[in-house]
């Protein structure tokens, strides 16, 4: 193992979101260990500027070009460079860094992640859309340039840790856990009337609104099933999800000898982030320690396809492969926009996704794999247009 630089150069894409803020929390606790190169965000200029000042970042970038004057004003006198727009995000990804957090939500995180891999860096991947929409391309890009991708989702970090030193050929099954979300105790017949406020309250995790609603609908878990297939190269038949209300076991890996290895930890994203930040070493993290005697009980049950139709759609997407993951993600994002805007009900989101997949399958074969990032972005836009049209009906 080659020695690390005296200070690790780090960049955080999506710095103002939940993952970004937890990453900043860990970095700020050890300023002697890190040099912050770039922080990026969207509309929360005050937070972006405050963090850039506090961490003495080289550059702060907002994705919103019209907010550049605000960012410049907020950074005046700090010595931190300000920039805005898609080109600026890519330029920030080109800046030399040893470790980059990819936490921009949605398809917007694709291009910066791909650009960073060209420089052979370590990419901590919290942007699950990258693997769902362009998994084979992303992994090929990393291999071509000698880059490392580390998963930051708590479930995939747990699987990754359970597989250290193991032969992937000996893996019989991978089980990722789901809390069930904020509506898990609602009668199934009542789910159709759930509001964004109802679905946006999570019993265990402190996350942003969109991902919390995706947790309630299990679209988040559906994405993670697809992500598991892409990242670990395991066949869909060997990947499953189980509802685990306590959110203390994040994933389990079953082996051909019958052993089942579980990863336990508190529902705190700083654990998965900290593991990726310090990999291959482990560092002390400011997270709660589990008291097994106090926990006393761990529960599991199988999720229902009628309650969580997103899981059924995800299994079909895993079997189909090709561009279906990209379509699934794009339609899911449009459907969530529609739910947040009050245009459709909570249980209508899965219908938008299914309709979009069906509509695009009539245009071409969903199993045709995209060959370039441009192919992915084109498919993404087509799917968004179709899903938006369905939403407008």
From Swiss-Prot:
One of its GO terms (molecular function) is NADPH binding. Its cofactor is Mg(2+); Mn(2+). Its EC number is 1.1.1.267. It comes from the Bacteria. Pfam families: DXP_redisom_C (PF08436), DXP_reductoisom (PF02670), DXPR_C (PF13288). InterPro entries: DXP_reductoisomerase (IPR003821), DXP_reductoisomerase_C (IPR013644), DXP_reductoisomerase_N (IPR013512), DXPR_C (IPR026877), DXPR_C_sf (IPR036169), NAD(P)-bd_dom_sf (IPR036291). SUPFAM superfamilies: 1-deoxy-D-xylulose-5-phosphate reductoisomerase, C-terminal domain, Glyceraldehyde-3-phosphate dehydrogenase-like, C-terminal domain, NAD(P)-binding Rossmann-fold domains. 1-deoxy-D-xylulose 5-phosphate binds at residues 128, 154-155, 179, 202, 215, 220-221, 224. It is an enzyme of class 1 (oxidoreductase). It catalyses: 2-C-methyl-D-erythritol 4-phosphate + NADP(+) = 1-deoxy-D-xylulose 5-phosphate + NADPH + H(+). Keywords: Isoprene biosynthesis, Manganese, Metal-binding, NADP, Oxidoreductase. Belongs to the DXR family. This is 1-deoxy-D-xylulose 5-phosphate reductoisomerase. The gene is dxr.
